[in-house]
């Protein structure tokens, strides 16, 4: 699947530790190689009526948040530790 990133996502990714940046890179390679959301590991739709088309992927204690756009591309919005991730996303 194709994806684009927000400025906030790029900034948050730069602030990750080296180990978590490597894990994120592996996850992004997996995203590029998959064809459907159901093939992404640990991917779940966000709950709530205002969160339609918003998803998160769990990797360790970190979460990657994205929105599925109408053309089928993923818009990566945020990445960060589980604790405060859900306060910021979506």
List the predicted regions and their residue ranges.
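Arg/Lys-rich, positively charged N-terminal/basic patches that mediate binding to nucleic acids
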Residues: 1-28
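ATP/adenylate-binding site constellation spanning eukaryotic-like Ser/Thr protein kinases
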Residues: 6, 51, 79-82
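A short, surface-exposed loop/turn module that caps and links secondary-structure elements
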Residues: 30-56
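Residues that recognize and position ribonucleotide moieties
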Residues: 2-3, 55-57
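Conserved short hydrophobic interaction patches
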Residues: 27-31, 82
